[in-house]
């Protein structure tokens, strides 16, 4: 079984709760060997909150976690950085702790001590309060792994989407849609299909404009940038079609006509995916030298530490990480 490092995320959010709920779930116990990278105090508080009979086994070195734990025992690398955190709010302390967890997990994965990482939600506000400037997990991990070409991808229900631009204001998106950027994303889309074990994938490209530009009447990015990118990708042997009108392509993918949709911007892809898999969507980063997945939701401070957080997305993120291959 794959060993997976599960980062605890922001201790003030729902991360500790959904991790504990996920790791005692029957679908997870037999699918992988999880090791939490986090802090003992919040996890013990989460176990007590949930009234679960679970034991934490603290390990500090790779040698210690070569022997699989027995029964309802969960392994933890105790970072010792979040003993007193104000719950339900973004804080500099929580932001700093969540970054430390990620740094440790990435180190373990790069050194081949674990086979992949699954990251619980962090708060962009909290990590900025702690003095870090990354926009989010994806950019942070790409820097930690010295990765230049990467993409954010989401899996949920029958849909899989990959983004050409990530956390970009909508008004800036058109200026970022270039042939080179789209080709790069198409190459990563092909890699994603390989990671998922697809032998004959069908990749679609969504247009940027209404009706995919309608031959230039509603915008010419399709003519200038996206069409040339599709032609170049086809020349490289990438199985791609499009660009398709954005209001049509997701229905085609939902029916199984395509395995993966390349989307021009964040909400173009995330809105349809969350319509069909709001509670079970998974974020994965493509292009890294390591496997990384994450639940497709945030810290949910508003319901944190009430015992009501839904672990479904975390469960799916762990299951997907256990199946992926580099």
Predicted regions and their residues:
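A generic local secondary-structure boundary/capping motif
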Residues: 65, 142, 150-153, 194-195
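Ligand-binding beta-strand-loop-alpha-helix segment within the catalytic cores
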Residues: 154-183
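Contiguous, glycine/small-aliphatic-enriched amphipathic segments in soluble metabolic enzymes
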Residues: 1-137, 180-264, 268-274, 278-283, ...
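Glycine/threonine-rich beta-strand-loop-alpha-helix active-site module
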Residues: 129-151
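Conserved hydrophobic/aromatic beta-strand scaffold that supports enzyme active sites
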Residues: 140, 152, 161-163, 290-292
């Amino acid at each position: 079984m794959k060993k997976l490092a599960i980062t605890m995320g922001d201790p003030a959010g729902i991360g500790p709760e959904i991790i504990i709920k996920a790791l005692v779930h029957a679908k997870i116990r037999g699918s992988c060997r999880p090791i939490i990278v986090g802090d003992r105090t919040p996890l013990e508080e989460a176990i007590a909150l949930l009234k679960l009979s679970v034991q934490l086994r603290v390990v500090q070195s790779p040698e210690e976690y070569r022997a699989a734990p027995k029964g309802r025992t969960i392994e933890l690398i105790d970072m010792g950085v979040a003993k007193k955190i104000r719950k339900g709010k973004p804080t500099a302390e929580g932001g700093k702790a969540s970054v430390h967890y990620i740094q440790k997990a990435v180190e373990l994965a790069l050194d081949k001590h674990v086979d992949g990482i699954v990251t619980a939600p962090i708060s962009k506000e909290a990590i900025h309060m702690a003095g870090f400037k990354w926009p989010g997990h994806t950019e942070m991990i790409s820097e930690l792994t010295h990765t230049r070409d990467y993409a954010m991808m989401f899996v949920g229900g029958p849909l899989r989407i990959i983004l050409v631009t990530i956390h970009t204001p909508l008004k800036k998106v058109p200026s970022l849609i270039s042939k080179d950027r789209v080709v790069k994303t198409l190459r990563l889309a092909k890699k994603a299909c390989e990671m998922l074990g697809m032998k004959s994938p069908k990749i679609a490209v969504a247009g940027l404009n209404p009706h995919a530009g309608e031959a230039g009447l509603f915008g010419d990015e399709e003519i200038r940038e996206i069409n040339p990118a599709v032609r170049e990708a086809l020349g490289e042997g990438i199985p791609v079609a499009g660009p398709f009108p954005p209001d049509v392509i997701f229905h085609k993918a939902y029916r199984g006509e395509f395995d993966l949709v390349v989307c021009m911007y964040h909400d173009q892809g995330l809105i349809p995916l969350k319509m069909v898999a709001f509670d079970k969507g998974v974020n994965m980063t493509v292009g890294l030298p390591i496997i990384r997945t994450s639940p497709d939701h945030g810290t949910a401070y508003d319901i944190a530490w009430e015992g009501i957080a839904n672990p479904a997305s975390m469960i799916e993120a762990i299951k997907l990480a256990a199946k992926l291959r580099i």
